[in-house]
């Protein structure tokens, strides 16, 4: 009989959502969301503890509880390799990538590529690739995994559950900027770890300890005779009923179908560089740190936390197979369809089945609340990130004169379009992932992300890399990966009891080896084309490479002058002349030359002046501009004060409330003090300062966490 949520569980779920909403609204009330740094980078005020927790929970969502546990149930320890690999790559982010992003004065990854290479081609390529990955590996997978949880706990239809999730996300979305996200993520991380540890302890006690888990897992096969009698199956064939012989090893032989060690080291690791070092969702959180020490501390904390999923997710998935082998290890497609609604396999229900069967009333509701809340947080982040990327990096290049309200409308329409595509993709995920959703995510990503990783690594470590090389190398890698992905969709793996008649280059070449080829081919083409074309300018590599100077230089043209207006007028004009991106957005048809003719009260800057990598904080917000518009590739927008007043009067109290809720805020330049501007500049200059004692402690932590990661790889692979 299926276990369901009791009244006490539902009450705890409701209380948890109320608490999360209160935290979000508190962050909305207290935080400054009217500036670029305030909205997108939490005012660069977050500590290492909060960011470390946010990094962990933004990665470990419900799709990981479904996917990691499911792969643990199906194939043993192998899937834990991604977690230990992430532990190491997080330190690459903290010690190499983040200092460069801070020194460059960028907020987004497309912005970094534009600043490093110039032009818009690579920016558009990266934006389009990000949107594809959001739809096919994030949004649709999140919807499917969350729906599985609801289906297991309430017994609802999968697609009814998907629609419910989208509706709940729309109702509970809080637009408090990154402060609210990090605060709620911190709460979710605490409860998620406590809940998962509790489940691990309960399940371990049920089995008899870790050594007993390893022994009994190798014996966890379904009772075929009992299943045939119970389910009255017309198909009496059985397949994949026994655990794999090397299930207790992490990195396996070169021909293994799950984790071949050469493919993982040479292909999967470079591909993962994109997610951990160049994905906006991850990088944005670390950029919110007070300084570089807090940024490094956050990656250390997240690295130590990444030791946990192997034990609190993967191992419980294996225990679920031990306890419920007849369901988790279904014997053929017909049986799988009756158990979980998927002919590909039922290992994905391992974790929710364990929660519903072993966890006591009350704690069960808390676990369900954490899973769904984490899922909705992921959905909200994906919606906002995708909308931002599409409107600013794609749509605005097509329609340069688009107003801010037009961009807001287009962004929301695009989100609706993404939701429709993602829901339509759910049934394909159900059947394509072969019962292991996590490996589906990795396969799709490995066909598309290695070229991006190659471009970022070359951009950072090789000064000679230029725009032409990066573009043609990236496009070559993308085309090859897209062709391979299309073939993978066209030649889908047959059901387990059917012969595999796919072409040899599809069924015999593991996707990690394809990722290896894509990474190195992209790098080779990029190097060759870069050497055959002119080198990048000094301005493009001054602050954007690993070899850049460690200090920031503030030019006089971007420094405060005696009068606020003169400073801002000269800053925008001179910084614009030296900037790579000169296509500034001037609303209402104003030209750049007309700036000099405006009065101080008519000018409202929404831009950071990034000369020589020095990010000066945004100097105000028009009510008609969204926080998203504010950071649009370091571009300036001006609007007359009279027009802003007219819009406010027309909107009345209703629009004032909407503006506050969404974080829109008007602030005249004449009211902005020189002290505020100079303090913000000083903060940016101080972010890269690192006291010797703190640096020593951080380096000791770096050695410790990397040593632990390598030890775990060796221990679980021997």
Curated annotation (Swiss-Prot):
Coiled coil: none annotated. It catalyses: myo-inositol(out) + 2 Na(+)(out) = myo-inositol(in) + 2 Na(+)(in); scyllo-inositol(out) + 2 Na(+)(out) = scyllo-inositol(in) + 2 Na(+)(in). GO terms for molecular function: D-glucose:sodium symporter activity; fucose transmembrane transporter activity; myo-inositol:sodium symporter activity; pentose transmembrane transporter activity; polyol transmembrane transporter activity. GO terms for cellular component: apical plasma membrane; basolateral plasma membrane; plasma membrane; voltage-gated potassium channel complex. It is a multi-pass membrane protein. One of its GO terms (biological process) is inositol metabolic process. Induction: Up-regulated in response to hypertonicity. Residues 30-38, 111-123, 184-186, 325-353, 431-443, 533-695 are cytoplasmic. This is Sodium/myo-inositol cotransporter. It comes from the Eukaryota. Interacts with KCNQ2 (via the pore module). Interacts with KCNQ1; this interaction is direct. Forms coregulatory complexes with ion channels KCNQ2-KCNQ3 and KCNQ1-KCNE2. Electrogenic Na(+)-coupled sugar symporter that actively transports myo-inositol and its stereoisomer scyllo-inositol across the plasma membrane, with a Na(+) to sugar coupling ratio of 2:1. Maintains myo-inositol concentration gradient that defines cell volume and fluid balance during osmotic stress, in particular in the fetoplacental unit and central nervous system. Forms coregulatory complexes with voltage-gated K(+) ion channels, allosterically altering ion selectivity, voltage dependence and gating kinetics of the channel. The keyword Transmembrane applies. Belongs to the sodium:solute symporter (SSF) (TC 2.A.21) family.
């Amino acid at each position: 009989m299926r276990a369901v949520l009791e009244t006490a569980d539902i009450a705890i779920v409701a209380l948890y959502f109320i608490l999360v909403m209160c935290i979000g609204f508190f962050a909305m009330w207290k935080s400054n969301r009217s500036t670029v740094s305030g909205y997108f980078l939490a005012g660069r005020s977050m500590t290492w503890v909060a960011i470390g927790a946010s990094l962990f929970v933004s990665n470990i969502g419900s799709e990981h509880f479904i996917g990691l546990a499911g792969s643990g149930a199906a194939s043993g320890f192998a899937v834990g390799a991604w977690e230990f690999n992430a532990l190491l790559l997080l330190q690459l982010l903290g010690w190499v990538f983040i200092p460069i992003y801070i020194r460059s004065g960028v907020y987004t990854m497309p912005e970094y590529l534009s600043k490093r290479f110039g032009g818009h081609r690579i920016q558009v390529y990266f934006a389009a690739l990000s949107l594809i990955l959001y739809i096919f590996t994030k949004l649709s997978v999140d919807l499917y995994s969350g729906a599985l949880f609801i289906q297991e706990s309430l017994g609802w239809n999968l697609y009814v559950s998907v629609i419910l999730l989208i509706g709940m996300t729309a109702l509970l979305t809080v637009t408090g900027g990154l402060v609210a996200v990090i605060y709620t993520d911190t709460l979710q991380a605490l409860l998620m770890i406590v809940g998962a540890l509790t489940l691990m302890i309960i399940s371990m006690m049920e089995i008899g300890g870790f050594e007993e888990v390893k022994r009994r897992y190798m014996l966890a096969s379904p009772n075929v005779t009992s299943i045939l009698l119970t389910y009255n199956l017309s198909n009496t064939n059985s397949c994949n009923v026994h655990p794999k012989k090397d299930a207790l090893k992490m990195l396996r032989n070169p021909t293994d179908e799950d984790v071949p060690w050469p493919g993982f080291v040479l292909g999967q690791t470079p591909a993962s560089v994109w997610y951990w070092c160049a994905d906006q969702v991850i990088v944005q959180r670390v950029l919110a740190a007070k300084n570089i020490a807090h940024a490094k501390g956050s990656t250390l904390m997240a690295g130590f936390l990444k030791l946990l999923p192997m034990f609190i997710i993967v191992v419980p998935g294996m225990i679920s197979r031990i306890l419920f082998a007849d369901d988790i290890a279904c014997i053929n497609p017909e049986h799988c369809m009756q158990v979980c609604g998927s002919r590909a396999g039922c290992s994905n229900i391992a974790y929710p089945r364990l929660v519903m069967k072993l966890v006591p009333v009350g704690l069960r509701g808390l676990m369900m609340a954490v899973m769904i809340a984490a899922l909705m947080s992921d959905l909200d982040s994906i919606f906002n990130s995708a909308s931002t990327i599409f409107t600013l990096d794609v749509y605005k290049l097509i329609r340069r004169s688009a107003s801010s309200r037009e961009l807001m409308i287009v962004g929301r329409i695009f989100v609706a379009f993404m939701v429709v595509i993602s829901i339509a993709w759910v049934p394909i995920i159900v059947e394509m992932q072969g019962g292991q959703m996590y490996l589906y995510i990795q396969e799709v990503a490995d066909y598309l992300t290695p070229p991006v990783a190659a471009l970022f690594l070359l951009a950072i470590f090789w000064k000679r890399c230029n725009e032409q090389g990066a573009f043609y190398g990236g496009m070559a890698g993308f085309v090859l990966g897209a062709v391979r992905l299309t073939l993978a969709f066209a030649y889908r793996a047959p059901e387990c009891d059917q012969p595999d008649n796919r072409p040899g280059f599809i069924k015999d070449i593991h996707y990690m080896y394809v990722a290896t080829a894509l990474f190195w081919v992209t790098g080779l083409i990029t190097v060759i084309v870069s050497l055959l074309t002119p080198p990048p300018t000094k301005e493009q590599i001054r602050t954007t490479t690993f070899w850049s100077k460690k200090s920031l230089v503030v030019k006089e043209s971007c420094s405060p002058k005696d009068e606020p207006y003169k400073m801002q007028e000269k800053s925008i004009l001179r910084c614009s002349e030296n900037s790579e991106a000169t296509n500034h957005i001037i609303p209402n048809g104003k030209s750049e030359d007309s700036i000099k003719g405006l009065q101080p009260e008519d000018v409202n800057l929404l831009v950071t002046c990034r000369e020589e990598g020095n990010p000066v904080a945004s100097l105000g917000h028009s009510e008609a501009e969204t926080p998203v518009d504010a950071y649009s590739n370091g571009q300036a927008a001006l609007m007359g004060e009279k027009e802003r007043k007219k819009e406010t009067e027309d909107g009345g109290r209703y629009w004032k409330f909407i503006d506050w809720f969404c974080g829109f805020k008007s602030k005249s330049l004449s009211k902005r003090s020189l002290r505020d501007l100079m303090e913000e500049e000083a903060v940016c200059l101080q972010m890269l300062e690192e006291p010797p004692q703190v640096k020593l402690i951080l380096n000791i932590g770096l050695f410790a966490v990397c040593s632990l990661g390598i030890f775990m790889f060796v221990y679980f692979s021997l």
